[in-house]
């Protein structure tokens, strides 16, 4: 009877129902992997593996360019971005392109240019992927010794890690240069309702930047998600970029320490598991960031955060009832607490009613009305500006609630039908991606550790039920 798994590999292999199937001249017998195992068949064919990765990058960039142009074609300047189902243009607007005071979109040409540039670069990547997959050398180091690598070569792997870190550091500095020198970025906190500005006074104090990492993730502390001014965000990118670049140089110049050589598994599947674990952490962090943070993700483009929409509702009705003669400082609600205003656990004046749970919200349209002890009653009576009323009424009716199938918004709000917040989409998608990547991390880590320990050789095929079944035709 044939051996249906490769004795050369210590890795679990699924059985093909039809063992005669051969794809691209590589069948399960010769490679140890079934046709659907994709890049696993290319583990030792560095040229073809390069082609697969370059082609994959081309697909990603093609999607970005095509989706970008699709959003430009459908964009209407008379409605806010978050009402139009856009997920890419808000990112470009946040970078300061095409935006005027108050977050108004005044020019869509930069968005068109972005889409075209991505399409052109995707064509270059696509050509490179096809070339390396079909025409280039199967094993690239036979032609270019510089690119020789073996998965178990710890020194070469850390050199590759170093190169990746340097590229990530350069990416972080691209945002820094955009904010400092190339037109600035959109600041939702700019006076009068937000504007594009250059960042001139970076926060570089390590106690502030790394203080975010040491904060509690709970309540008003909010870990790194609590960052609420662009000086801190851009300064943080200076730190991250510098650490990545210097760390990359260090990894290129050094060899792994003995403890690292012992503690880590050095195989292709292990590196895959480490990468998936890191991406999982990124996904969960991005989920929290886009859901709660209205500085890095301005509400003008992404819609209000949940707490922001709730506080906006309380503010809108306070404005209305105050105009009708209500004394908002004294009126009691059905609970005996203040109907419009009450005190937080720390004694600050906050909005009353159900929105009290969001008392530590900070938002650009609300902060001018605060004094040293929370909301200032005098300012609420005399200083509310029309733009604050308009914005809160808009945010009240566009809460990031509901399902992802275009019946979101506040259930009782007739104007919110067929509205789904990009915040809901981005937070949900990144949570799901973070979860699945974490499962993938556990799966591949378990396989890699088992292979390293030498006991993972797949299922005993002699008694596998499928062998007694009729082959699929």
From Swiss-Prot:
Topological type in the membrane: Multi-pass membrane protein
Modified residues (N-acetylthreonine): 15
Positions bearing Phosphothreonine: 15
Superkingdom classification of source: Eukaryota
A GO BP entry: photosynthetic electron transport in photosystem II
Transmembrane stretches, start-end: 69-93, 134-155, 178-200, 255-275, 291-312, 447-471
Co-factor: note: Binds multiple chlorophylls and provides some of the ligands for the Ca-4Mn-5O cluster of the oxygen-evolving complex. It may also provide a ligand for a Cl- that is required for oxygen evolution. PSII binds additional chlorophylls, carotenoids and specific lipids.
Statement: the UniProt record of this protein carries the keyword Phosphoprotein: yes
Propeptide: 1-14
Cited Pfam families: PSII
Binding site for [CaMn4O5] cluster: 367
GO cellular component, one term: thylakoid membrane
GO molecular function: chlorophyll binding; electron transporter, transferring electrons within the cyclic electron transport pathway of photosynthesis activity; metal ion binding
InterPro entries in alphabetical order: PS_antenna-like, PS_II_antenna-like_sf, PSII_PsbC, PSII_PsbC_sf
Subcellular location, record wording: Plastid membrane
Keywords: Acetylation, Chlorophyll, Chromophore, Manganese, Membrane, Metal-binding, Phosphoprotein, Photosynthesis, Photosystem II, Plastid, Transmembrane, Transmembrane helix
HAMAP family: PSII_PsbC_CP43 (MF_01496)
Function: One of the components of the core complex of photosystem II (PSII). It binds chlorophyll and helps catalyze the primary light-induced photochemical processes of PSII. PSII is a light-driven water:plastoquinone oxidoreductase, using light energy to abstract electrons from H(2)O, generating O(2) and a proton gradient subsequently used for ATP formation.
Family: Belongs to the PsbB/PsbC family. PsbC subfamily.
Oligomeric form and interacting partners: PSII is composed of 1 copy each of membrane proteins PsbA, PsbB, PsbC, PsbD, PsbE, PsbF, PsbH, PsbI, PsbJ, PsbK, PsbL, PsbM, PsbT, PsbX, PsbY, PsbZ, Psb30/Ycf12, at least 3 peripheral proteins of the oxygen-evolving complex and a large number of cofactors. It forms dimeric complexes.
Protein name per UniProt: Photosystem II CP43 reaction center protein
Gene from which the chain derives: psbC
């Amino acid at each position: 009877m044939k051996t249906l798994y490769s004795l050369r590999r210590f890795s679990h292999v699924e059985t093909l129902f039809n063992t005669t199937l051969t794809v691209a001249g590589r069948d399960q017998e010769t490679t140890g992997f079934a046709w659907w195992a994709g890049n696993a068949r290319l583990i030792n064919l560095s040229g073809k593996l390069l082609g697969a990765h370059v082609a994959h990058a081309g697909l990603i960039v093609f999607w970005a360019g095509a989706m970008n142009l699709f959003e430009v074609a459908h964009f209407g300047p008379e409605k806010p971005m978050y009402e139009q189902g856009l997920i890419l243009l808000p990112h470009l607007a946040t970078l300061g392109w095409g935006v005027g005071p108050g977050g108004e979109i005044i020019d869509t040409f930069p968005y068109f240019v972005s889409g075209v540039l991505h399409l052109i670069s995707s064509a270059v990547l696509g050509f490179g992927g096809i070339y390396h997959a079909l025409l280039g050398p199967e094993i690239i180091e036979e032609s270019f010794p510089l690119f020789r690598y073996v998965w178990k070569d710890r020194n070469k792997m850390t050199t590759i890690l170093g190169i990746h870190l340097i590229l990530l550091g350069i990416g972080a500095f691209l945002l820094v240069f955009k904010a400092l020198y190339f037109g600035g970025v959109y600041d939702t906190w700019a006076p009068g309702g937000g504007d594009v500005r250059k960042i001139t006074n970076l926060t570089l104090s390590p106690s502030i930047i790394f203080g975010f990492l040491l904060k509690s993730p709970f309540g008003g502390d909010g870990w790194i998600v609590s960052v609420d001014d662009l000086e801190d965000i851009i300064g943080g990118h200076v730190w991250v970029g510098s650490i990545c670049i210097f760390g990359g140089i260090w990894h290129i110049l050094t060899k792994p320490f003995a403890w690292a050589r012992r503690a880590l598994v050095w195989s292709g599947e292990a590196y895959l598991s480490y990468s998936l674990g890191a991406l999982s952490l990124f996904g969960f962090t991005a989920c929290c960031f886009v859901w709660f943070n209205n500085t890095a993700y301005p509400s003008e483009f992404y819609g209000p955060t949940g707490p922001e929409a709730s506080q906006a509702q309380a503010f809108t009705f306070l404005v209305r009832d105050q105009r009708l003669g209500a004394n908002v400082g004294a009126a009691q609600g059905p609970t005996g607490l203040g109907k419009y205003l009450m005190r937080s656990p720390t004694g600050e004046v906050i909005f009353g009613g159900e929105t009290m749970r969001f008392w530590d919200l900070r938002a650009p349209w609300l902060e001018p009305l605060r004094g040293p002890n929370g909301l200032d009653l005098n300012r609420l009576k005399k200083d509310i500006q029309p733009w604050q009323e308009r914005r809160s009424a808009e945010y009240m009716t566009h809460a990031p609630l509901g399902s992802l199938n275009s019946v979101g918004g506040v259930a009782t709000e007739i104007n919110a039908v067929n509205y789904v917040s990009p915040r809901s989409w981005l937070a949900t998608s990144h949570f799901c991606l973070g979860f699945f990547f974490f499962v993938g991390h556990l799966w591949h880590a378990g396989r890699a550790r088992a292979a390293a320990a030498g006991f993972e050789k797949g299922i005993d095929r002699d008694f596998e039920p499928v062998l007694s079944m009729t082959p699929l035709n």
